[in-house]
Amino acid sequence: MLSPTKSFALTCLLLGSFARVVLGQYSVQLDLTEQKAYLLYNDRAVMQSPICSGRPGHLTPSGTFHIIRKDLNHVSSIYGRIVDRWKRTVVVDADVDMPTPAGTRFINAPMHYFMEFAPGIGMHAGYLPGYPASHGCVRLPEKSAIAFFQALPVGAPVTVFGAIPRNRQYQVNNRDDNQRYYDRFYNDPRYYYRGRVITPGPFGFWQ
């Protein structure tokens, strides 16, 4: 016969398992080799998306993580661009410590639908050039970022695996293979950032 303490612990375990089955749990897997993200529901892939991960020297860390925080209108605290008084880009890939010539200013890079899973590293909407090019973050197409942002709560598991092979070209797949999930999340105005306009630099300088 189980003691009251063990009986209570077993009850909590069973209730927790039941809640996970009934309520479901979203998680995400990031494949750095194939440059793809997979949204999972109860360990079953329900949506996939192309990504842009960290470039050599700024590699996206591999391992098991959890969503630490979410920020709809996040901006990078380090990276951005330098523009002149007419808002023309002077320096595409700039950082906050870079000297700004007279008449110019530094603009922090927008990282909408930011989902941080490691210190300073997260998933967010951004430009996908077709190869790993970020400063460590994982860029997603806007539609995918909205869907992931709504589906993944703080605490959701994030698994990052694989490695970027050298001299490999990636084909960015933007087909709406996941239209049911896009429609479910993308059309929810609660998850629109102000303006919903992404204007990346020509060489994809954002993190």
Question: Each predicted region: which residue ranges?
Answer:
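N-terminal signal peptide c-region/cleavage motif recognized by signal peptidases
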Residues: 17-19
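Cell wall/extracellular polymer interaction/catalysis modules
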Residues: 21-88, 93-106, 112-113, 156
